[in-house]
Amino acid sequence: MSLLRIRKPKTRKGKKVLLAREPQLIESARTMLFLDGRKCGGNVKLCMKDLQALKKPLVKVLNRKNDITPFDDPSSLEFLTMKNDAALFTFGSTSKKRPDNIILGRIFENEVLDMFELGIKRYQAISEFKNEKIGACVKPCLVFNGPKWAQTEELRRLRNLFIDTFQREKVDSIRLQGIEHVLSFTVTDDMNILMRSYRILLKKSGQRTPRIELEEIGPSADFSIRRTKIASEDLYKQARKQPKQLKVGKKKNISTDALGNTKGRVHLGKQQTGSIQTRRVKALRKTPEEKKENRQRKKVALKAAAAEALASQGNNPFSS
């Protein structure tokens, strides 16, 4: 049950705000909501601050402390995400039972879709790395190391959540100098998640392709997976469903060969080649002698037709 009473808009601006919150055919990049629990400090504050820096400008921060327990009762969290029009959220808290705790999750139709509780075992903030940083609003390259990301459904969903979190606007093409940032995620044997952040350096190699070096710029974190809550297969399939308008229809009689060439087959009806108007080339025109012969043939044909008509009238007994 929603805690926010829906009221009909009375102004044009209010209508535009509600229309912007409705599902769009092409969704924009997702905004993340950051909020604190009853007690929050230390590594949790540093981690959330660095995540805000990586996610900017698609962030909304609530500075007040919230008495929320997302895994027990997510209704207050769903209300805040709906009110702030955020599809992603990060909730930070710390307690004696679960120290240095952050919860990452996403929303679908104003309800929690997936939610993962991660414990911070080790953390190095961006400020601890004394080197040059990347610019703002840079789209990072996401690297998921190892086959363990596909072993369980929880890890597959967590990988998908990381992609949703750091994904920005979709682009058709990129330039080589625009690739500046790499975020690496690794699952260890004891099911810990190692997050590393690198800056890409393009060095001269004497060839057309530059030599690439990685410089760690932070944040650097080791997470342990605590509690998880994932959606059912039917709900997850519904959340991933694309509108019919965006689906590419199957094109008939079109195929692609091994070299990537597109070939098409066209079906035509029976053609009347005798009535096709062709270009009259001077070399194909008739000579005066041929024209004279044609006129004589026409005259002979007309005389023969007239004689045949007279003969048929003479043989008719009823003719006067």
Curated annotation (Swiss-Prot):
One of its GO terms (biological process) is ribosomal large subunit assembly. Residues 302-311 have a biased composition (Low complexity). GO terms for molecular function: rRNA binding. Belongs to the RPF2 family. GO terms for cellular component: nucleolus. InterPro entries: Brix (IPR007109), Rpf2 (IPR039770). Residues 268-320 are annotated as: Disordered. Pfam families: Brix. It is found in: Nucleus, Nucleolus. This is Ribosome production factor 2 homolog. The keyword Cell division applies. Residues 30-234 form the Brix domain. Keywords: Cell cycle, Cell division, Mitosis, Nucleus. It comes from the Eukaryota. Required for normal assembly of the mitotic spindle. May be involved in both centrosome-dependent and centrosome-independent spindle assembly programs.
